[in-house]
From Swiss-Prot:
This is Large ribosomal subunit protein uL16. The lineage of its organism: Bacteria, Pseudomonadati, Pseudomonadota, Alphaproteobacteria, Hyphomicrobiales. One of its GO terms (cellular component) is cytosolic large ribosomal subunit. It comes from Rhodopseudomonas palustris (strain HaA2). PANTHER family: 50S/60S RIBOSOMAL PROTEIN L16 (PTHR12220), LARGE RIBOSOMAL SUBUNIT PROTEIN UL16M (PTHR12220:SF13). GO terms for molecular function: rRNA binding; structural constituent of ribosome; tRNA binding. Belongs to the universal ribosomal protein uL16 family. Binds 23S rRNA and is also seen to make contacts with the A and possibly P site tRNAs. The gene is rplP. Part of the 50S ribosomal subunit. Keywords: Ribonucleoprotein, Ribosomal protein, RNA-binding, rRNA-binding, tRNA-binding.
Length: 137
């Protein structure tokens, strides 16, 4: 699972995801990609599940790029603990994804295989997505 090696602070504010993605909104590496259509926090487990679905369907042919990284810690209090007495311990890591952000890119496979693989990966994510392809030059 992905998580930062070192962070400046142990805990983060919840925050909100405003606006649309300005950086990371176009394909940079591969021929095909999966683009987010709504704002959402995507966990490290969800990213890993999507990556596994992608590589499994592609039968390890081609190349996969993960364009998001879970760098925000989410804290949680233990079960059946009364409110108060501080913020809970860090439980999981999430990536804040804005609409328009390209989350996954793949290359080295044909368009039909790419679309099928990215559809399977999209099913593992809590977010509406769209298949994007680089225009042939």
């Amino acid at each position: 699972m992905m998580q930062p090696k070192k962070t400046k602070f142990r805990k983060a504010h919840k925050g909100r995801i405003h606006g649309v993605a300005s950086s990371g909104a176009t394909l940079a590496f591969g021929q095909f990609g999966l683009k987010a259509m709504e704002p959402e926090r995507v966990t490290a487990r969800q990213i890993e599940a999507a990556r596994r679905a992608l590589t499994r369907h592609m039968k390890r042919a081609g190349r996969v790029w993960i364009r998001i990284f879970p760098d925000v810690p989410v804290s949680k209090k233990p079960a059946e603990v009364r409110m108060g007495s501080g913020k809970g311990a860090p439980e999981l890591w999430v990536a804040r994804v804005k609409p328009g952000r390209v989350m996954f890119e793949i290359d080295g496979v044909n368009q039909q295989t790419a679309k099928e693989a990215l559809t399977l990966a999209a099913a593992k994510l809590p977010i509406k997505t769209r298949f994007v392809a680089r225009i042939a030059e």
